[in-house]
């Protein structure tokens, strides 16, 4: 009983020290990234991208669109709260030497510091692919991933629309990585910003890559917007986040994925407002 009381005292003190920093960090990243991507794709460049729309969100009734976005923002705020609480533990663990964070840029050298960015990216992609597949198991889906899949036609606000269980699973890549390998403080900050922008773009609802990239042997390793959009449409396959190679290696990429990208990137606007596929 005394240990339980000690824990609650420690946690209350940690919350007092960290809550505003954690909340500001998590909320700022979500709202800045999602609103920037939404304004850029759905408002500023909507005219130029209209033939690249992947779903039917634009043709739905305004009240239905508003309900979807409200739901996505609500669950995203819930995820921000989960991330805030878990960040408190992360900060406290880092302060007590549990995790291998460091702030001296010379401690492990420049090569390691920059190389760790790529290493973390690859680690996150692998973690995302396998945890994502696991959450599609019937035993886990209802409690973790079902909320995210209520959206069949994503918007940038879908990025953090998770059940608390999925939010917790997604958060764990940073503490797991930092338990094993050193991670510079600023590398972590830059990565978290990159991750949320990449997440919002993956749910943008418009294909953004140039025509031909998806079929390129190197550029095609990048997971396009279509790649993740098809996952939302079909609720299976295309589990990767940054890259396509795990899906290709494990045979989980949709067979018509490249054709869908071609369809989105080759369409040209017709004078009458219709569209056609060229090539």
What are these model-derived regions, one by one?
Residues 22-37, 111-124, 187-191:
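Alpha-helical transmembrane segments
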Residues 10-14, 38-71, 94-105:
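Membrane-helix interface linkers and caps
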